[in-house]
């Protein structure tokens, strides 16, 4: 079972219907207690759409379909960023690198999303944290994407009476 199916099971209190009659510009639509998802999307795009529509459930209220309204675009952005953080979390970026995953194609397969979604997630994290961030004992650098284990380095300060000093 993949992440899309897992997410459907986790949120089984919400009816998710895959349909053919959504407008071309919409991959999914939140309708209060129901989510419609375009049936013709690949499974990776369905997962991305489901995560974003679930984020709308958490963050927004009412209809925000009219994207000419500034506040509607703002709420759309909030939901998209939450979807990035749910589907490509920092802890799993570390996990992927520890498993030897080092290129975009492998990362997209690891997260079960499109390569474009991985790139958008990394861009989101760069905007949120800057060039890099710490996660536990790791440093995640966003461009180029790399993960390093962070270690404190202690040196012996001989002249000062043999004290250990953290640098």
Listing of model-derived features with the role each one plays in the protein:
Residues 1-167:
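Active-site hotspot residues in diverse enzymes, especially metal/ion-binding acidic/histidine motifs
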């Amino acid at each position: 079972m993949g992440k899309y199916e897992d997410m459907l099971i986790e949120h089984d209190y919400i009816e998710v219907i895959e349909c053919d009659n959504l407008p071309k510009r919409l991959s999914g639509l939140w309708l209060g207690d129901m989510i419609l998802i375009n049936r013709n999307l690949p499974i990776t795009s369905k997962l991305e759409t489901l995560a974003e529509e679930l984020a709308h459930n958490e963050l927004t209220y009412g209809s925000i379909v009219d994207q000419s309204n500034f506040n509607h675009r703002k709420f759309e952005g909030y939901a998209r960023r939450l979807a990035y953080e749910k589907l490509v979390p920092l802890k799993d970026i570390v996990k992927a690198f520890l498993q030897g995953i080092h290129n975009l194609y492998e990362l997209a397969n690891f997260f079960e999303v499109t390569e474009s979604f991985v790139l958008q997630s990394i861009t989101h994290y760069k905007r949120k944290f800057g060039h890099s961030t710490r996660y536990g004992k790791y440093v995640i650098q966003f461009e180029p994407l790399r993960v390093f284990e962070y270690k404190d380095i202690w040196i012996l300060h001989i002249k000062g009476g043999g004290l250990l000093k953290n640098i």
